[in-house]
Regions:
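Active-site microenvironment for binding and transforming phosphate-containing groups
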Residues: 1-158
């Protein structure tokens, strides 16, 4: 049984095992907890790439609160309008927030997205002047194989 009293409920993703009504309710509660409405909380279908969506204003009706609505396949959001609260969901991957004169970016950064340049894309999009990195998996719990090393070397050199 999930604790339904938390301000940011964990059951926020539509999946095979999730009750759509619960997900809608939890996303509505999450938006309220940050002082906004679901249409002001951009969210995407995170696919471990470097694509970023740009949002200039709230989306109504919101795909964020509607089960069965196809979400854009993006791992980052740039918001340029007032009243928007971009959201990424993470477990092992890093949440990265960037801010600058061009807006605010919220990025879902797994190793594939990092190697593909998602942080650079987000930083350029908002002309980043500041950044914050949230918690993610560390070396104690994630083994990096030669395929990961090869991708990073191809992207960034030795």
């Amino acid at each position: 049984m999930r604790d339904q009293s938390a301000a940011a409920p964990p059951d926020s993703r539509f999946g095979a095992a999730d009750d759509p009504a619960s997900v809608v309710e939890n996303r509505t509660r999450l938006a309220a907890a940050v002082g906004t409405r679901p249409g002001s909380v951009p969210i995407g279908l995170q696919v471990h790439k470097a694509d970023i969506a740009v949002h200039d204003g709230p989306q109504e009706p919101s795909p964020y609160a509607e089960p069965g609505t196809a979400l854009e396949e993006v791992d980052g959001h740039v918001v340029r309008g007032p009243g928007l609260a971009p959201l990424v969901l993470t477990a092992d991957c890093l949440p990265v927030a960037l801010a600058g004169p061009g807006g605010v970016a919220m990025l879902h950064c797994g190793w594939r997205g990092l190697a593909a340049g998602i942080i650079a894309r987000g930083a350029l999009a908002v002309e980043a002047k500041s950044a914050a990195i949230g918690p993610g998996i560390g070396p104690c719990c994630f083994e990096v194989g030669p395929e990961v090393v090869a991708e990073f070397r191809a992207a960034f050199g030795e």
